[in-house]
């Protein structure tokens, strides 16, 4: 009984082997071009070009839709639109790739000064991820508005005067020497923007995954958003609002100005240096330090859940909160203090302006260095620690007990604005600025 079963199984196995061999032979030779099962495709490129006449006295509008390939647009001192096309095909041999490249189709449409370039990927299988591509290299008159929408490939636009709108699913995006409104969106890729003057228009940059770098920007509102990536502003000047948001990545803003500045990150360091903000400077950081150096603002609202806050140079209303971290403020001038840390030390050096002022730490020492001529009404309290002051205090209330609780209330230099300082566990030390 067992022998017929064994013979049957052997026959079935032999049939399957034959079918497998036949399939391999068929798929290897049955596809004349672009064999989807051949993972060793070779590339072949072909170049084509076309010159389009336009009215040089009127602005040009260029629209590019490219499913796969790089797009480069350059403005220049020309009176025509010059289009160079680079087609790239893949197949198992050079001969097959040469045939395949002939099948790549794209379109160039013109309606007056409006030009549209388009390449769509054919709906065919290709398991080795090598898809046919079309690169568009375009030279346009300087006064040209540009719109680019591509799925795979790098995008670069430079030297144009007009609105620029760039969208890319996967690939880096670069814009340089633009005069006009700028909008860039990418799902995955770095974005680099340099030398943009949008006038009273906006600059808006978004990417899901990738770093954002902006340098030498002038606009009304400037915004940069990345779900995962660092954001860097250098010499960015917004007459309106400046907004930066990244979920994961450091934020750096150096040399610039804005009416308002908002920086929001879930995880990363925030560093702002030599930036002038006429109204509010607001930062929110879940995990990371906040560092401000000579960042002048009408008011400050700084908050981090876990990280230190360091400020060198400030003026006006200053609110700084951290759940876990130290707060250090130096070279402050006429500030209104609202400072708190749940766990960490607080160090302040500078002058106080209009009150009331409040400084609080749940666990940590508080050190304040104030001018010798500071006029304040003070209320100092610590549950576990000591209060010391090198500035003379006219005491109206003092309390000390064996439980280590210490409280002192009174006035400095005849009194003035209210300063309240408290810590649950730590000392309070008041010194004079030398």
Language model feature labels by segment:
Residues 125, 156, 213, 232, ...:
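Gram-negative outer-membrane beta-barrel proteins
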Residues 1-61, 66, 70-150, 158-168, ...:
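Acidic (Asp/Glu) and glycine-rich low-complexity loops/linkers
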Residues 271, 279-367:
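Eukaryotic tandem repeat interaction scaffolds
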């Amino acid at each position: 009984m067992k022998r017929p079963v064994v013979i049957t199984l052997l026959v079935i196995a032999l049939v399957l082997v034959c079918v497998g061999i036949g399939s391999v032979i068929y798929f290897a030779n049955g596809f004349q071009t672009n064999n989807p099962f051949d993972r060793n495709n070779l590339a072949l490129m072909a170049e084509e070009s076309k010159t389009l006449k336009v009215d040089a006295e009127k602005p040009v509008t260029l629209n590019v839709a490219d499913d796969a390939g790089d797009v480069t647009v350059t403005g220049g001192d020309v009176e025509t639109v010059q289009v160079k096309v680079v087609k790239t095909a893949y197949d198992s041999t050079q001969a097959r790739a040469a045939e395949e490249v002939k099948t790549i189709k794209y379109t160039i449409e013109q309606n007056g000064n409006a030009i549209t370039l388009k390449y769509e990927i054919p709906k065919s299988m290709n398991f080795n991820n090598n898809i046919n591509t079309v690169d568009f290299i375009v030279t346009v008159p300087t006064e040209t508005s540009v719109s680019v929408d591509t799925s795979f490939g790098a995008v670069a636009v430079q030297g144009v005067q007009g609105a620029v709108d760039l969208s890319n699913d996967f690939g880096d995006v670069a814009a340089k020497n633009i005069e006009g409104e700028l909008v860039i969106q990418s799902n995955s890729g770095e974005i680099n923007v340099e030398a943009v003057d949008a006038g009273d228009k906006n600059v808006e940059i978004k990417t899901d995954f990738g770093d954002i770098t902006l340098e030498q920007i002038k606009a009304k509102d400037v915004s940069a958003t990345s779900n995962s990536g660092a954001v860097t502003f250098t010499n960015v000047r917004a007459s309106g609002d400046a907004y930066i948001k990244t979920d994961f990545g450091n934020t750096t803003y150096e040399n610039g100005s804005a009416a308002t500045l908002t920086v929001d990150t879930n995880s990363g360091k925030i560093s702002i240096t030599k930036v002038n903000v006429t109204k509010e400077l607001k930062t929110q950081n879940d995990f990371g330090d906040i560092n401000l150096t000579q960042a002048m603002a009408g008011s400050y609202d700084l908050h981090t859940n876990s990280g230190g806050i360091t400020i060198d140079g400030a003026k006006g209303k200053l609110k700084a909160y951290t759940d876990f971290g130290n707060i250090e403020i130096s070279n402050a001038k006429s500030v209104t203090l609202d400072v708190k840390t749940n766990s960490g030390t607080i160090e302040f050096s500078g002058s106080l302006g209009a009150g009331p002022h409040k400084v609080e730490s749940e666990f940590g020492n508080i050190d304040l260095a104030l001018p010798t001529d500071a006029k304040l009404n003070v209320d100092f309290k610590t549950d576990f620690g000591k209060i010391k002051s090198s500035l003379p205090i006219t005491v109206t209330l003092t309390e000390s007990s064996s439980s280590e609780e210490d409280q002192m209330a009174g006035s400095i230099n005849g009194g003035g604005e209210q300063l309240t300082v408290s810590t649950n566990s730590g000392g309070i030390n008041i010194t004079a600025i030398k």
